[in-house]
Amino acid sequence: MNNLRIILLVFAFNSPVFADLEQPIQLDAGQITGTSMGSGVQAFLGIPFASPPVGDLRWREPQPVIPWSGVKVMDRKGPDCMQSRNTNLMSEDCLYLNVWTGAQSSADKLPVLVWIHGGGWRFKATYDGDAFADNGAILVSVNYRMNAFGWMAHPALSEESENGVSGNYGVLDHLAALEWVQSNIEQFGGDKDNVTIFGESA
């Protein structure tokens, strides 16, 4: 019995504590919870960083997320953006990002890596980031509009735009995601003043 108590005490003192991040996290738009990936990594998948770019918001600058009430469970990635080389679930409603963190609380100040996937602006989607989080960094992977949905410019679209221009919606999605990081990443234990952008191909 004494041996069992010793084993339990050793386990308790050597187990990572995620009391802070296991509770709902308050973002600008509302509260969320994530899921444990093991090895002390927490994942928050499918977080909206802009309103769905559909209907009147198609071929427009990304717009702020509409706030929600209650707590959303973020344990599944959002759909991939529309593309030709893909057999996964796709949708125009695709402006979601994912966060992997090994922080033990929101008071931590871990470096943040923002991954922008490749694919020549035409295909692919977000990657998994648990390996980065397991090595002391927070990884954010981002979806963005591609093909005609991300880059098409046309005089008629420019006339409808508040800024008088059209095109480059995919890059504007990148900027919206980075603004989201600046506003929210500290809630995941990240340092908003230590953010690195990286990627490949695109």
Language model: regions and residue ranges:
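Active-site loop->helix "elbow" adjoining a glycine-rich segment at hydrolase catalytic centers
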Residues: 118, 169-173, 201-202
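Alpha/beta-hydrolase fold nucleophile elbow
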Residues: 111, 189-200
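Alpha/beta-hydrolase active-site loop
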Residues: 94, 163-187
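Non-catalytic accessory segments of hydrolases
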Residues: 19-168
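Sec-dependent signal peptide recognition
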Residues: 2-9
